[in-house]
A protein has these predicted regions:
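Polytopic transmembrane helical bundles with strong interfacial aromatic enrichment
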Residues: 1-123
Length: 123
């Protein structure tokens, strides 16, 4: 399972770089400044949590238990729901997608709590 978090974290970080480049070079002038800022927010949170997945992989390799693994799954879910809904909101101009974005944010928060608790227990 350790490899899973390293691989998924690295892939999501790479996709975050690609999304950031797309936002900077492909969306500027095509969407409103507010929507461009929304896209940047999605990229930022994706990158932070992709890097967090690498930390989860490292902690799991050090013997992290189910709480650490749960944190990793929450980070993946958070990226898919939080960043994914914001990307789709910007690209499709479908505003109702903003209603599910907080669910991804909640997954991030739960993930950080699980990660802290799991690392504390393993110390």
């Amino acid at each position: 399972m350790t490899r899973f978090f390293f691989v998924v974290g690295a892939l999501l970080a790479g996709l975050g770089v690609a999304a950031g480049a797309f936002g900077a070079h492909g969306l500027e002038g095509r969407v409103s400044p507010d929507r461009l800022e929304t896209f940047r927010t999605a990229v930022t949170y994706q990158m932070y949590h992709a890097l967090a997945l690498l930390a989860v992989g490292w902690a799991a390799a050090q013997g992290g238990g189910p709480l650490v693994h749960g944190a990793g799954y929450c980070f993946v879910a958070g990226i898919l729901v939080f960043s994914g809904s914001l990307y789709l909101l910007v690209l499709t101009d479908t505003s109702w997608l903003g209603a599910i974005t907080p669910l991804g944010g909640a997954a991030f928060l739960v993930g950080w709590g699980l990660f802290a608790w799991g690392v504390w227990q393993g110390a």
